[in-house]
Regions:
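Radical SAM/AdoMet-radical enzyme domain recognition
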Residues: 1-115
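Generic recognition of stable, solvent-exposed alpha-helical segments in well-folded globular domains
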Residues: 27, 65-68, 97, 132-135, ...
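Short acidic/His/Gly/Ser-rich catalytic and metal-binding motifs that mark active-site loops
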Residues: 47-51, 119-122, 244
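Short, conserved loop/turn and helix-capping segments at secondary-structure boundaries
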Residues: 56, 60, 127-134, 258
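Amphipathic, soluble alpha/beta structural segments
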Residues: 91-98, 161-177, 228-254
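A C-terminal junction/extension of Radical SAM enzymes
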Residues: 121-200, 240
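Flexible mid-to-C-terminal extensions adjoining Fe-S/redox cofactors in radical SAM and related proteins
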Residues: 198-285
Length: 285
């Protein structure tokens, strides 16, 4: 259907597939390599970390099942246009070991990011965790510089930064474009600003049959930018994070024009590390 609509409307649709790997097989890999501009392979890192958060109904983990499939999948895409994507929690604050574990498995495109959860959850990241997490990012950045020198480097999504080009001004101001340039569509055809708002009727924009019915919600998201957020105005990182995630802001503060504080702190640390890596690489040249 998508390819048909491309021709009719002179558009180029790019599709992404996210998989936990359990049902992944050669047929699906072949289809994804033909049709998907990017694939996201969901794995949290070391076996004990992954299996703890992702058990089957009977308690067994999926690590041993999915790793060989993911390695094959990544190689079939020439180690490009994919990410192995993990989430670290309060249970594995030493997450740099998970990133390096994935790199040692042969993956070249890696993204491991902090869980976003309410403080009542036992796995939630807490403010007192921040000093250790800062150390982990420093440790990871130093190891990446070392591996770059040795020729066995890899990309870590949250350290990728473009100091000379990067997104346009509009993107730097407002980020992902949720509710304006970007929508989530449910299997029932309902429209929401993004997938994290799905199910919250206060953010139900409309449906695919009738279109946008709540233009007022879209207008509110249009005003969601770094200059409208008090916490962002004087922050050195505002044009790199673009104000952070509107859903996280709403879930923690009840307002899309606020900012998720732990996320802000970690984002600033990641930008510092990314700049350090750029400086280290420049010194080599």
């Amino acid at each position: 259907y998508g390819r048909e609509q491309e021709k009719i409307h002179n558009k180029n649709f790019r599709f992404t597939l996210t998989t936990n790997g359990v049902l992944l097989n050669d047929e699906i890999m072949e289809f994804a390599n033909k049709e998907m501009g990017n694939v996201v392979l969901s794995i949290d890192g070391r076996k004990e970390v992954h299996d703890h958060m992702r058990p089957f109904r009977k308690g067994a983990g999926s690590y041993d099942l999915i790793v060989p499939k993911f390695q094959k999948f990544a190689d079939s895409r020439n180690q490009d246009k994919y990410y192995v994507r993990g989430t670290f929690t309060h249970n594995n604050l030493d997450f740099s070991n998970d990133v390096l574990h994935l790199a040692d498995l042969g993956f070249k495109q890696i993204s491991v990011e902090p869980v976003v959860a309410q403080p009542t959850e036992d796995y939630a990241i807490r403010e007192e965790d921040l000093p250790q997490l800062y150390e982990e990012y420093d440790k990871l950045a130093a190891e990446m510089v070392k591996r770059h020198k040795n020729g066995n480097d890899f990309n870590f999504f949250h350290f990728m930064i473009d100091l000379e080009g990067g997104p346009c001004v509009a993107k730097r101001l407002s980020g992902c474009g949720s509710g304006t340039e970007y929508l989530a569509v449910t299997p029932w055809g309902d429209l929401y600003p993004c997938h994290q708002f799905v199910g919250n009727e206060d953010f139900l924009l409309g449906n695919v049959d009738e279109g946008i019915k709540r233009q007022d919600i879209c207008d509110e998201f249009k005003c969601c930018n770094v200059y409208a957020k008090e916490k962002c105005r004087n922050c050195f990182a505002k044009f790199y994070c673009s104000g952070g995630c509107a859903a996280n802001s709403y879930n923690f503060h009840g307002d899309i024009h606020n900012a998720y504080d732990i996320g802000c702190a970690l984002q600033k640390k990641r930008i510092e590390c990314a700049i350090m890596i750029k400086a280290a690489e420049a010194d080599e040249e």
